Design a protein with these regions (language model features):
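Non-catalytic interfacial helical region
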Residues: 9-16, 20-23, 27, 98-229
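P-loop/Walker A NTP-binding region and its immediately flanking N-terminal helices
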Residues: 1-135, 161-163
């Protein structure tokens, strides 16, 4: 148990190369996008630690890398680490992507953060003609930042996509929710076990997991952090 704790290195959602358990949702989003009916403001709602951010980053990579070398693989739902957009996203430097979240010194997403998103939307695009905004932990919006965000959402065009991540144990303002198309992400117990096994395989080279207790301790550690490190 102690060895697991000491050697554990959590892979951030934006750096996860493999996507497990979201194949149905991913294929559904692809069909909507190819038919030009993918909602521009998508609310991903589900339990904390269920992989919503990882799913969002994978689909964002699919969109941004579509015409690039080493593009996203829809055959096995993996990101190529040599892909240009993946590298930019990992460094938070992709010109067509903006992350809106609370900063380290505050539990709230501030109005100034939303203003920065607006500035991003007013800039020209590069590499592709779409822009993407990921709003992590939307429940951290306060009244002022929510009002500012509403104005941004009202001006969204068909080349801009918002992925809004919501921990469904927390409440969000109805005014924000009403601007989104909500996708409630849910997994059965058997699906969760399958996902867990795949995640553990991903870490097998880091350390050896021998007992069931260690497996579940491992699972709790990698899914318990609500903040996404930069």
């Amino acid at each position: 148990m102690n060895n697991v704790s000491e050697n554990l290195t959590v892979i951030l959602p934006k750096k996860q190369l493999h996507l497990f358990g979201y194949e149905y949702y991913f294929n559904s989003f692809i069909k909507l996008y190819q038919k030009y009916i993918l909602p521009n403001v998508i609310l991903l709602s589900g339990p904390n630690g269920s992989g919503k951010a990882t799913f969002a980053y994978h689909f964002i990579n699919y969109l941004l890398s579509y015409n690039e070398k080493d593009k996203y693989s829809v055959n096995d739902f993996t990101i190529n680490p040599e892909n240009k957009s993946y590298k930019y996203l990992c460094d938070n430097t992709h010109p067509n992507f903006s992350l809106l979240e609370n900063d380290e010194l505050s539990e709230n997403i501030k109005k100034d953060n939303v203003r920065n998103t607006l500035k991003f939307l007013n800039k020209s695009t590069y590499f592709s003609d779409i822009k993407i905004v990921l709003i992590d932990n939307v429940e951290y919006l306060n009244v002022h930042s929510s009002n500012a965000l509403l104005k941004v959402l009202e001006e969204t065009n068909n080349k801009t996509f918002f992925f809004v991540i919501h921990n469904n144990s927390c409440k969000i303002l109805n005014t924000i929710k009403s601007r989104c198309v909500e996708f409630k992400l849910f997994f059965t117990l058997s699906e969760k076990i399958k996902i867990l096994k795949n995640i553990i395989k991903q870490y097998k080279d880091n350390f050896k997991i021998e007992t069931i207790d260690e497996c579940f301790y491992f699972f709790l550690r990698i899914t318990s952090t609500s903040r996404r490190a930069p």
